[in-house]
Each structure stands twice: as C-alpha cells, then as structure tokens.
Amino acid sequence: VTKQTRSLIIIPTYNEAENLEPLVTAILALDADFEILVVDDNSPDGTGEIADRLSRELPGIHVMHRPGKMGLGTAYVEGFRWAIERGYDYVFEMDCDFSHDPGYLPTFPTKITSADLVIGSRYVKGGSTPNWGILRRLISWGGNAFARLMLGLKAHDCTGGFRCYRREMLQQVPWDKIRLQGYGFQIGAVYYVERLGGKVVEFPITFEDRRVGQSKMSSRIVMEAFAYVIRMALSDKKRGDVHTLKSETT
C-alpha cells in the first residue's frame, strides 16, 4: 500500500488580517489536500484571532502563535520543526499577501518528486515581476546576481520565498546557522541545499504586488542579506570553497 504524502504550507503573518482568510479560502478551493500552518507574530491587527477562527471552522488549518515580531526566517524555522515532528513529506513557504498566486501550488508536487527544493522563480524564462518599479527590480535582480556570483549558486531566484522542500532535505540543512530576519534567509537556504548536494528545480511564476497591507521590505533587510552573502563568501574562501558540505556533515 502506497503511503499518502502529506503537504504543509507555512504562512508567516504579521498584520495580514485582510489577506489571510481570502488566501486560505483560495488554497482550500484547489482541493489538493494541502494543510496550512499560520505562524503569527502577535499581529496587532487581529490576524492571529482570524487564524484561530479558521482553524476551528476548517479542517487542516493549524496556528502557531509567537510572542512578537521575530522575523521571517525564525518563523519558517519553527514551522519546519513543527512539520518534521508531525511527519509531513513536503513543506511549502508562501507569502500571505497574494504576491504568490495560489494557482501555482499544484505545480510544486509534480516537481518535488524528483527534487529536494522547488522554487517558483521570477528569474527563469517565463517568470516576471510586472508591477514593480525600476528601483525594486534593480535591488531584487542585483541581489540575486550578487548572491549567485559570490556564492557560486546555480539557482536563479535565490531570494524568492515561494518554495517547497522535501522533508529529508529540511532535516539536513543547519537552520541554526541561518539566523536572519529577512530574505537573506532564503539565500542561506539555497546555499546549504546546494552545498549538501541537493537538487534545486525552478519553474516560472508571475510575482504580483501585494493586494492590501504594508510591505515588510526595508533597507535593514537588504543590508542584512548583503552582509550575509559577504560573510558566507569569505567563509567559503577560508575553507577552500569545495562547494559541498557533505564531507563536513556526515
């Protein structure tokens, strides 16, 4: 008897009261057996209360409450641990603001069967960011190019947060070494997946601007990612940059 695979979508939230219920409704409408874990950082706008109500009313909706705003990276790491403890096979990352179209979700399971990490990519052929201004495109594209160049990464969209991990890879990545608040966390995750010999597969997505609410992007998050890439590049150089951690982790 073939064991049914279990998939969990982790959605970190901070002040997403207007977006959360429409997003959950859209995901469940796919009828694809996705479960959802909302990780809420004590949102002042009542997002956590909405999440609790949804978990009572709907099957497969789980909620983790944290005491305050602790950042994207730690939300995902706590969510990953929660998922591993409960035996999920495939674990997704997804923004709550509809910049990640739920319609792409069914594509991930078709790719993850032959990969360790699948990324919905803005920077492979067919991917796009249609509503972005020049400055935002420059920062995002430049940040990706910088990370790929400095760290020798093969993935095109190293900062994108629409992802699916295979559980076995989640268990190998040293998450405690990626203590970052913003999208630098995503760069660190790709770095370790590739260094561990994992297979990364990308497919094109159209990345939309958030529908409602405030963007979480800040200059501090950009600088955090920049500093992280420099630090890891220097670390690679120091140990001879063999582009693999397998010998170190076995």
Task: Give the role of each language-model region.
Residues V1-A26:
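N-proximal low-complexity "stem/linker" segments adjacent to membrane-targeting elements
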Residues E93, I119-S121, F203-I205:
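Short glycine/serine/threonine-enriched helix-capping/active-site loop
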Residues I11, F34-S43, M64-H65, M94:
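Short beta-strand/loop segment that forms part of the nucleotide-sugar
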Residues T25-F34:
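Short, acidic, metal-binding catalytic loop of nucleotide-sugar glycosyltransferases
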Residues V1-S7, A145, M150-L153, W175-T250:
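Hydrophobic helical membrane-anchoring modules
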Residues E18-P22, D45-L54:
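Acidic helix N-cap motif at the loop->helix transition within catalytic regions
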Residues D40-E49, F98:
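A conserved acidic beta->alpha catalytic loop
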Residues H62-E85, Y90, P102-Y183, R210-A225:
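Acceptor/aglycone-binding surface of glycosyltransferases and processive sugar-polymer synthases
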